[in-house]
């Protein structure tokens, strides 16, 4: 059978097609393999840039494996399409050129790593990207101008928490048709957005836009309404001013609008409520809005969170609004001027969890039907209002309540027993009202209660025994009531009790020793009662406790310290959340006191492992007997107030061991004997009052005691010495017979020498040996005598400090570890000689970290020696490591560390001596009373620039970066060229590393220079340093100290300067000495005084300083920006160092 030609042709074609298909598949496979190999090489190239991979994420990135098997890599169709290494903790100096050839990559996620990555590298990414997430990845620089137009396929961009600077690129919204999510939050972007073109066609896909946490300024652009599908808009924490555009009401799909923490003004536009029916979250807090709350907000029926706090909104709160808010969960209206009756319609908010009406002018009564209407309510905050009436018993029907704060109102009646039904209640705060009656026993049912703060009321009766069932209680304050009976000993069973305030009541009986069992007690105030008996020694033997997690967490405290004798006790501790500081001036019982608000923050203690009481006030009672020696075991004690009792005996020597003690008042007692010499060691002591006792003998002349006013030692007939009249010299004669002893000794030596010669003639070999031994012994005796004499001089009367070196062998021979050749052979003995035994005459300063002495060396050069405060622990290894690090830091605007030395328990640092002393002394006059030097504008500007450059170097050029923590004018020293040198950098870190017991206030800065956020958290930051140098800059410009009650009243230099700026009175901030200079011909020759070039420069300088002291850290510039801004001022560098333009 023959095959037809047609079949042959068909078979041939099939064969040819099959061969072609095999060839194509082979070529395609070869191409895919090649592309995959290229992808692998790109990823491995990126891996070589990684210097640290703590979680070994990249351990399986190997040439032997397919890149599709690499951790964090996803492939599709044999190509790499997604890289996700977010949160891996990778670090290194990287570039995106490694990813350029990944032409199938669509998703790149590298957030939360520690790269050093220049923003220009963004332009090296593949054009195929649709999703880019690089938050917290170390990006620096400006956003590239053509980035958004080049990557027009991007759907989502997240670049938050980096260090972008400069303005937003002009093409941001021009080529973003596909872009749905853009997050540039928490960078350092500046400039306005009002000039950006936002066409409707390019912004139509945008649903999420976040520019928060930058320094963007100007008004909010109307053209944002072209983003018609926008669901979330966040412009918070910027510098926007002007009004909210009325056109925002056209954003009909908007669910979240956050404009908080800006400088917006005007009324809240009613249009927002007219059309935003989908709005769920509205945050307008921390602005300058005025007017009333628009009733049109009632249209936002889906609203879940409404935050209008910290504005100047006035008028009554519209009742109709709350009736429409069926979904509302959070309502924040604090710190406004809202008046009228407390809104009764709040009971209609069935889902409401948090209601904060603090610091307004609400009046009327708390609605009786508040509960169970608002059955979900967890926090009810009403402090600092004008609310009257009683606490409604029905409040117990809000069973979810955790916090009730009714402080600073005009409530009366009694505490309803029904409050015991609130089983979840943690805080019941109602201080300063007119609440009367007894404390209900039902309080004992509150097993979760942490804070019971009822001071300044009219409570009577005794503390009920049921109260001690509240086993989780942490803060109890019944101060300034009319409570009676004895202080219950059951306080000792409260294992979490930290603050106990029972002062100014009618308690009788003795102080229960059981209080010493409270392992976490740090604050005990029993002043102004009728307590008798002795101070129980058991208090001083309080067992230390490890830190308890969450102790007093969430509390905002203020310590109102009394000054003078107008009020009893040292002061009072109050819960200050939601209360304006100026309200303290309006409280009658406090207004009669001369007081200063000394501290506010979350907690006054670090609760160290060896924690004991920090504040003890037993004044104004009828206590007898001796002050127990065990008080000296309270190693954390900072305030000890024992005045106006009937205490007798001597002051215990052990009190001088309380190295953190800052206030000690034992006045108006019957104390006898001498002031212990150990008090010389109290380096933090700022107030002592021993007046009206029977003390005798000299006041210790070393340490702080002789520097305090004489009034604090008055009416002690036998007391003498500075600051009182000199003591009669009856027992200070030098020992007799010293010279005779020396002559006898020399005679003996001469006789021995003669005998040696005779013996040498007879037995020459033996005489040589004896002579050598004898010479060595004599030299050793002489050296020992000289050493003893020199060491004795350290403890002599003229020595300005105390020493602990007795355990050190041959201390005088110890070398000073130095970082400069010319000081290589320096020994401790030479430092003693150079300071005349560290005498008071050689002391040139003292501060929180120790005393400073001027030492003149034998070659005529001078150095400064800082003797650090004596630390409680021996951290030799940490000390030496820190010194070696600090010794390597060199910059022309830093005071260089030349060397260091450890002798016994003492640590000495050797610095270069600065001829003109500190900026504080130059600005405000030296303490010696000499005439102060008047600084001109060019000198002041030069000093400000130098100090900024020094701090900038610490922040940005040191590895690791150094946060100063205590930047102030006394830590800016001036060399022979009047060049500013920052000193004491690294000290706070050193001290805190070596001594965990040191008070927080010592390590967190100096009053007047401390940024507001430090009072909410003890975490020191670089932006905190920026605030502090901003204060120094204001100090330079104004010539005023940062704190001065006579000058600023209840505010400080920062608050006063901001007020003058708001009022348009900028010129009043400038120092009068500069204005005198400014009125001269050199300033106003051509343009007139206020229009003069230099005056304009001063005002620009003021603007920079005010930016540094912004209340919000995110709005402050970093030090690179500060230096750049100061550099833009009309330069004086041409007259000084030619290199002053660089760091």
Curated annotation (Swiss-Prot):
Query: A Gene Ontology CC term for this entry?
Result: plasma membrane
Modified positions (Phosphotyrosine) are: 911, 1009
**Where in this protein would one find the motif Cys pair 2, according to its record?**
720-727
Q: Which residues are glycosylated?
A: 84, 118, 163, 188, 226, 234, 288, 312, 412, 469, 506, 681
Residues where Phosphoserine is found: 1001
Location in the cell: Cell membrane
Q: What are the GO MF terms of this UniProt record?
A: ATP binding; protein serine kinase activity; transmembrane receptor protein serine/threonine kinase activity
Report, as the record phrases it, the tissue specificity of this protein.
Expressed in provascular and procambial sites throughout plant development. Expressed throughout globe- to heart-staged embryos. Then, it is restricted to procambial cells by the late torpedo stage, and this pattern persists throughout the duration of embryo development. After germination, it is expressed not only in procambial cells throughout the plant but also in all lateral organ primordia before the onset of vascularization.
InterPro entries assigned to the protein according to its UniProt record, in alphabetical order: BRI1_island_dom, Kinase-like_dom_sf, Leu-rich_rpt, Leu-rich_rpt_typical-subtyp, LRR_dom_sf, LRR_N_plant-typ, Plant_receptor-like_S/T_kinase, Prot_kinase_dom
Catalyses: L-seryl-[protein] + ATP = O-phospho-L-seryl-[protein] + ADP + H(+); L-threonyl-[protein] + ATP = O-phospho-L-threonyl-[protein] + ADP + H(+)
- Catalytic activity, EC: 2.7.11.1
Function, as annotated, reads:
Receptor with a serine/threonine-protein kinase activity, which may transduce extracellular spatial and temporal signals into downstream cell differentiation responses in provascular and procambial cells. In contrast to BRI1, BRL1 and BRL3, it does not bind brassinolide.
Domain topic, free-text comment = Contains two pairs of conservatively spaced Cys (Cys pair 1 and 2) possibly involved in forming some heterodimers.
Q: How does it assemble?
A: Interacts with TTL3.
Q: What is this protein called?
A: Serine/threonine-protein kinase BRI1-like 2
Q: Which organism is it from?
A: Arabidopsis thaliana
- Upper taxonomic lineage: Eukaryota, Viridiplantae, Streptophyta, Embryophyta, Tracheophyta
């Amino acid at each position: 059978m023959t095959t037809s030609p047609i079949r042959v042709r068909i078979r041939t074609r099939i064969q040819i097609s099959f061969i072609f298909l095999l060839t194509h598949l082979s070529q395609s496979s070869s191409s895919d393999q090649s592309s995959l190999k290229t992808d692998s090489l790109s990823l491995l190239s990126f891996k070589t840039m990684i210097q640290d991979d703590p979680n070994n994420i990249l351990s399986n990135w190997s040439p032997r494996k397919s890149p599709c098997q690499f951790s964090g890599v996803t492939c599709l169709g044999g190509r790499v399409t997604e890289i996700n290494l977010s949160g891996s903790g990778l670090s290194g100096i990287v570039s995106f050129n490694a990813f350029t050839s990944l032409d199938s990559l669509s998703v790149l996620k590298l957030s939360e790593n520690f790269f050093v990555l220049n923003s220009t590298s963004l332009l090296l990414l593949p054009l195929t990207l649709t999703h880019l997430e690089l938050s917290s990845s170390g990006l620096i620089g400006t956003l590239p101008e053509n980035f958004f137009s080049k990557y027009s396929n991007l759907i989502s961009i997240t670049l938050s928490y980096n260090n972008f600077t400069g303005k937003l690129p002009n093409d941001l919204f021009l080529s973003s048709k596909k872009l749905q999510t853009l997050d540039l939050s928490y960078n350092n972007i500046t400039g306005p957005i009002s000039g950006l073109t936002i066409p409707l066609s390019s912004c139509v896909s945008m649903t999420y836009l976040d520019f928060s946490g930058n320094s963007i300024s100007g008004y909010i652009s109307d053209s944002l309404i072209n983003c018609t599908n926008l669901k979330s808009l966040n412009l918070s924490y910027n510098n926007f001013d002007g009004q909210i555009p009325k056109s925002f009401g056209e954003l009909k799909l908007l669910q979240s609008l956050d404009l908080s923490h800006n400088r917006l003004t005007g009324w809240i536009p009613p249009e927002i409520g007219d059309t935003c029916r989908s709005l769920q979250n509205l945050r307008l807090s921390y602005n300058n809005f005025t007017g009333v709350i628009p009733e049109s907000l009632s249209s936002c029926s889906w609203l879940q969170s409404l935050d209008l706090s910290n504005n100047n909104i006035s008028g009554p709160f519209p009742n109709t609004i709350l009736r429409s808010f069926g979904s509302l969960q959070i309502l924040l209206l604090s710190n406004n001027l809202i008046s009228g009756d407390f809104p009764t319609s709040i009971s209609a908010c069935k889902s409401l969890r948090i209601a904060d009406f603090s610091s307004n002018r609400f009046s009327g009564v708390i609605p009786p039907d508040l509960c169970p209407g608002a059955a979900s309510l967890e926090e009810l905050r009403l402090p600092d209002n004008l609310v009257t009436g009683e606490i409604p018993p029905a409040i117990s029907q809000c069973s979810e309540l955790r916090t009730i704060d009714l402080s600073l109102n005009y409530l009366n009646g009694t505490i309803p027993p029904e409050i015991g039904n609130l089983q979840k209640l943690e805080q019941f705060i109602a201080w300063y009202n007119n609440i009367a009656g007894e404390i209900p026993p039902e309080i004992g049912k509150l097993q979760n209660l942490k804070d019971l703060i009822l001071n300044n009321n009219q409570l009577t009766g005794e503390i009920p025994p049921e109260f001690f069932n509240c086993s989780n209680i942490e803060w109890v304050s019944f101060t300034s009531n009319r409570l009676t009976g004895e202080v219950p000993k059951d306080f000792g069973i409260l294992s979490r009790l930290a603050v106990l305030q029972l002062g100014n009541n009618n308690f009788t009986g003795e102080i229960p020793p059981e209080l010493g069992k409270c392992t976490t007690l740090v604050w005990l105030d029993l002043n102004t009662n009728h307590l008798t008996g002795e101070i129980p020694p058991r208090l001083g033997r309080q067992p230390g406790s490890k830190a308890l997690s969450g102790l007093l967490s969430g509390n905002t405290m203020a310590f109102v310290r009394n000054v003078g004798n107008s009020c009893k006790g040292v002061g009072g501790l109050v819960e200050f959340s939601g209360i304006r500081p100026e309200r303290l001036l309006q409280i009658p019982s406090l207004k009669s006191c001369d007081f200063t608000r000394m501290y506010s923050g979350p907690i006054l203690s670090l609760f160290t492992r060896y924690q004991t009481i920090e504040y003890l006030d037993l004044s104004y009672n009828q206590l007898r007997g001796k002050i127990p020696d065990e008080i000296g075991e309270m190693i954390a004690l900072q305030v000890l107030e024992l005045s106006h009792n009937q205490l007798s005996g001597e002051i215990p020597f052990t009190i001088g061991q309380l190295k953190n003690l800052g206030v000690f008042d034992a006045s108006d007692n019957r104390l006898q004997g001498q002031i212990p010499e150990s008090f010389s060691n109290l380096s933090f002591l700022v107030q002592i009052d021993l007046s009206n006792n029977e003390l005798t003998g000299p006041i210790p002349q070393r340490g702080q005691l002789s520097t305090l006013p004489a009034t604090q030692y008055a009416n002690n007939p036998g007391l003498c010495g500075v600051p009182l009249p000199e003591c009669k010299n009856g027992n200070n004669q030098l020992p007799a017979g010293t010279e005779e002893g020396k002559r006898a000794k020399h005679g003996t030596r001469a006789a021995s020498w003669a005998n040696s010669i005779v013996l040498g003639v007879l037995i020459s070999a033996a005489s040589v040996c004896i002579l050598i031994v004898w010479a060595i012994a004599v030299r050793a005796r002489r050296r020992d005598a000289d050493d003893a004499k020199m060491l004795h001089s350290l403890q002599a009367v003229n020595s300005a400090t105390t020493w602990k070196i007795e355990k050190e062998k041959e201390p005088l021979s110890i070398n000073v570890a130095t970082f400069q050749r010319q000081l290589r052979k320096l020994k401790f003995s030479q430092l003693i000689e150079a300071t005349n035994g560290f005498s008071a005459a050689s002391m040139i300063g003292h501060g929180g970290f120790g005393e400073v002495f001027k030492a003149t060396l034998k070659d005529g050069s001078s150095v400064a020696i800082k003797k650090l405060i004596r630390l409680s622990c021996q951290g030799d290894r940490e000390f030496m490591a820190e010194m070696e690090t600090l010794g390597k830091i060199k910059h022309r605007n830093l005071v260089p560390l030349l060397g260091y030395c450890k002798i016994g328990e003492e640590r000495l640092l050797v610095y270069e001596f600065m001829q003109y002393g500190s900026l504080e002394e130059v600005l405000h006059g030296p303490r010696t009373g000499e005439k102060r030097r008047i600084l001109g504008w060019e000198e002041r500007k030069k000093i400000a620039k130098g100090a900024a450059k020094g701090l900038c170097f610490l922040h940005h050029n040191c590895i690791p970066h150094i946060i100063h923590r205590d930047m102030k004018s006394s830590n800016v020293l001036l060399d022979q060229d009047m060049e500013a040198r920052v000193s004491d950098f690294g000290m706070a870190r050193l001290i805190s590393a070596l001594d965990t017991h040191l008070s927080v206030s010592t390590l967190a800065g100096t009053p007047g220079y401390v940024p507001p956020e430090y009072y909410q958290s003890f975490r020191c930051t670089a932006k905190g340093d920026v605030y502090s140098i901003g204060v120094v800059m204001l100090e330079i410009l104004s010539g005023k100290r940062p704190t001065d009650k006579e000058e600023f009243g209840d505010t400080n230099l920062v608050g006063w300067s901001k007020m003058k700026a708001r009022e348009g009175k900028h010129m009043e901030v400038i120092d009068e000495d500069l204005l005198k200079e400014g009125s001269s011909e050199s300033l106003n020759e051509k343009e007139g005084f206020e229009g003069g070039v230099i005056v304009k420069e001063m005002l620009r300088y003021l603007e920079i300083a005010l930016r540094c002291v912004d209340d919000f850290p995110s709005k402050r510039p970093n030090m690179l920006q500060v230096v750049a801004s100061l550099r833009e001022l009309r330069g004086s560098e041409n007259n000084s160092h030619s290199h002053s333009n660089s760091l």
